[in-house]
């Protein structure tokens, strides 16, 4: 009997010389047990001591007596396998012992093999019974693979699970199984025994399974597609060379033309602005047509010149209806205005008469502008609607005397928190100018001439000549000087102005 898993190809009688009759005793016991019964076999085994020797060698000294007694009592000696070869097991030793254990082998085995042989180690590199060892394909393993191939002639492509199953059955590796099936398919293809539809060149494992003709056809298709792509790229490149360059040049020319037009337009506008500034001089007294673009600048810069209280409380001034552009007047008409000295901000940016400036103007300014005696020449230019009757002026003065607060200046504009106007025709809103003190406007003769005061506050809508325009500007200049006097710190001033503005906005 052989034990290939342990490297023993044949068995030689390796018994110790001090027990030459152990094999005979064991054989007799087995034969007697076979003929007379289990009791006789057990008694003979126990008498000869072969079973005790076996058990002592297998289980160790402490368990030898108990094991022998149990075996003799139960009569298991006749049913032990290989009863004639029981003494050989001690020399084999335990299968899972460490390979360096000294007492595993029998002394006779040590005498026969003086040096340790690698085949005796249970954990060698390639044991004969190791299933992970690469095994050559034999007729038995290939017969199993051929049987599977015959059953699957229409689809000789085993899946991953089927390959694993076949590798376990045939004790081969997955690579060997896959290679065998690939070779079998190739052989059948050469023999014209294909009974399956050819697959693509690559399967799940990346192996080439398609036919050679299919591979050639696919290569030709790939080459044709590459050629077509190259031809398309060449055509596109040629079109770009033919038309793209001209189109780009045209675009560049258009862009250059546009840029030139823009530059010329910008230069023209700059020239016109420079010419207008040169014509107007340093005072900005040009015609209205030249000042269209400066209206927004005047409004924005005028806000900077006003005090903080005016900016926070004043509503936006009403739009003034301007007359259509008139032809520029000759420069000789500007001569009366030229020698008049005035700050540049007041001359360049004439402001419209606003309610906020009047409301926040001081009642007793420190000084009045010199040279304001008498009615200005612009009083005659006032429209006829501003001509006020003396009765209306007297009524406004009486209403003003009733209220001691500065809000009494506006009796006809606010009818809710203040006493209303007297019975009769409603006076004009500018009637308060007649009853206002003289120092309010900065004009000594303004109290006696309400029409002149109204004309001073109302900007002329359409000046007839350069002299009238200059006189109106002089009046406005004087008014601006008085309006921007430092306001004395009185707690009622801001409150009064806020009340007036809120009443005006609600009415």
Swiss-Prot record:
Q: Name one GO cellular component term.
A: axon
Q: Subcellular location, in the record's words?
A: Nucleus
Which key words tag this protein in UniProt?
A: Developmental protein, DNA-binding, Homeobox, Nucleus, Phosphoprotein, Repressor, Transcription, Transcription regulation
Chief subcellular site?
A: nucleus
Which residues lie within the region annotated Disordered?
Answer: 19-39, 193-398, 416-468
| Effects seen without this gene | Mice are viable and fertile but display a significant reduction of body weight, primarily through the loss of fat mass and increase in basal metabolic rate with browning of white adipose tissue.
- Where Phosphoserine occurs, the residues are 326, 329
Q: Where is the composition biased (Acidic residues)?
A: 213-223, 230-261
The answer to whether keyword Phosphoprotein applies is yes
Residues of the DNA-binding region? 130-192
Q: Which Gene3D superfamilies match?
A: Homeodomain-like
Instruction: Identify the tissues in which this protein is expressed.
Output: Expressed by neural progenitor cells in discrete domains of the ventral neural tube. Also expressed in specific and overlapping patterns with Irx1 and Irx2 in the developing and adult metanephric kidney. In the adult metanephros, renal expression is confined to the S3 segment of the proximal tubule, in the loop of Henle.
Report the function annotation for this chain. Transcription factor involved in SHH-dependent neural patterning. Together with NKX2-2 and NKX6-1 acts to restrict the generation of motor neurons to the appropriate region of the neural tube. Belongs to the class I proteins of neuronal progenitor factors, which are repressed by SHH signals. Involved in the transcriptional repression of MNX1 in non-motor neuron cells. Acts as a regulator of energy metabolism.
Q: Which family does it belong to?
A: Belongs to the TALE/IRO homeobox family.
This chain belongs to the protein called Iroquois-class homeodomain protein IRX-3
Q: Which gene encodes it?
A: Irx3
């Amino acid at each position: 009997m052989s034990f290939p898993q342990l490297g023993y190809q044949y068995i030689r009688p390796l018994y110790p010389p001090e027990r030459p009759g152990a094999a005979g005793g064991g054989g007799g016991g087995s034969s007697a047990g076979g003929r007379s019964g289990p009791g006789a076999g057990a008694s003979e085994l126990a008498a000869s001591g072969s079973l005790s020797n076996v058990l002592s060698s297998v289980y160790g000294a402490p368990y030898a007596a108990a094991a022998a007694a149990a075996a003799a009592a139960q009569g298991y000696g006749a049913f032990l396998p290989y009863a004639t070869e029981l003494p050989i097991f001690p020399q084999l030793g335990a299968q899972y012992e460490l390979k360096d254990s000294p007492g595993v082998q029998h002394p006779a085995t040590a005498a026969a093999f003086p040096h340790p042989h690698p085949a005796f180690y249970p954990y060698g590199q390639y044991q004969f019974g190791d299933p992970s060892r690469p095994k050559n394909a034999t007729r038995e393993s290939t017969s199993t693979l051929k049987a599977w191939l015959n059953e699957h002639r229409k689809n000789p492509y085993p899946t991953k699970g089927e390959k694993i199953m076949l590798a376990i059955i045939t004790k081969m590796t997955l690579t060997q199984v896959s290679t065998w099936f690939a070779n079998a398919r190739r052989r059948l293809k050469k023999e014209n025994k294909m009974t399956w539809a050819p697959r693509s060149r690559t399967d799940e494992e990346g192996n080439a399974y398609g036919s050679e003709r299919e591979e050639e056809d696919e290569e030709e298709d790939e080459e044709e597609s590459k050629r077509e792509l190259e031809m398309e790229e060449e055509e596109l490149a040629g079109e770009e060379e033919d038309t793209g360059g001209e189109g780009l040049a045209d675009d560049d020319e258009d862009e250059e033309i546009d840029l030139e037009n823009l530059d010329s337009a910008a230069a023209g506008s700059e020239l016109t602005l420079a010419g207008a500034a040169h014509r107007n001089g340093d005072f900005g007294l040009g015609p209205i047509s030249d000042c269209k673009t400066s209206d927004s600048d005047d409004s924005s810069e005028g806000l900077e010149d006003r005090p903080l209280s005016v900016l926070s409380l004043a509503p936006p001034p009403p739009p003034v209806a301007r007359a259509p552009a008139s032809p520029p007047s000759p420069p000789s008409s500007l001569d009366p205005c030229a020698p008049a000295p005035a700050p540049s901000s007041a001359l360049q940016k004439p402001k419209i008469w606003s309610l906020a400036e009047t409301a926040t103007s001081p009642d007793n300014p420190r000084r009045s502008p010199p040279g304001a005696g008498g009615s200005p020449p612009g009083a005659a230019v006032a429209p006829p609607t501003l001509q006020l009757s003396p009765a209306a002026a007297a009524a406004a003065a009486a209403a003003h005397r009733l209220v001691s607060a500065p809000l009494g200046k506006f009796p006809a504009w606010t009818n809710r928190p203040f006493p209303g106007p007297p019975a009769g025709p409603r006076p004009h809103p500018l009637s308060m100018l007649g009853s206002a003190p003289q120092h309010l406007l900065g004009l000594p003769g303004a109290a006696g001439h309400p029409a002149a005061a109204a004309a001073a506050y109302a900007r002329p809508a359409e000046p007839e000549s350069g002299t009238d325009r200059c006189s109106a500007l002089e009046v406005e200049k004087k008014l601006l000087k008085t309006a921007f006097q430092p306001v004395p710190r009185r707690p009622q001033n801001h409150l009064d102005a806020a009340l007036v503005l809120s009443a005006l906005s609600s009415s």
